[in-house]
Amino acid sequence: MRIRTVGKTGLQVTELCVGTSAIGSMPGTYGYSVGEDQALDTQRLVSRGPIRFIDTSNEYGVDGSSERLIGTVLRELGGVPEGFLVATKVDPDSTGDFSGRRVHASVVESQTRLHMDRLPLVYLHDPERIS
């Protein structure tokens, strides 16, 4: 798997990224549910595979369940594996608040669920919702 550098950040990622919204079990979006055991097994397999880049979001699943499940596996592994990058997204709250305070709170929520002190790559999720 080829590695690319993200702009001028120095962050290295594989050319492919594993999206993780489905492991948050979002049947309204995908038409099927994903059980917790299946989600954890999927993330364990991803951690051993050639794709070293995961994309998740504070908003995937109920109460950030996608991040929580990824965090469970990261904790089992003793942290983020060498050469692996976890990216997440900040999301507005249920009122649509996308203020600086909300962005900070979203980052802290993600750090807690993912068991990561530092998030190397964070996106704004669907910022058109506030325009």
Predicted regions and their residues:
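N-terminal binding-site loop/beta-alpha segment at the start of enzyme catalytic domains
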Residues: 1-84
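Glycine/proline-rich, positively charged
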Residues: 94-131
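Active-site beta-loop-alpha junctions enriched in small/polar residues
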Residues: 21-23, 57-59, 89-93, 124-127
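Basic side chains
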Residues: 2-4, 81, 89, 113, ...
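Generic beta-strand or strand-like secondary-structure segments
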Residues: 69-73, 89, 102-109
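Structural motif corresponding to the early beta-alpha repeats
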Residues: 77-98, 125
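Small/flexible residues
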Residues: 4-6, 91, 104
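Non-cysteine beta-strand/loop elements that form the S-adenosyl-L-methionine
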Residues: 14-19, 87-88, 116, 120-122
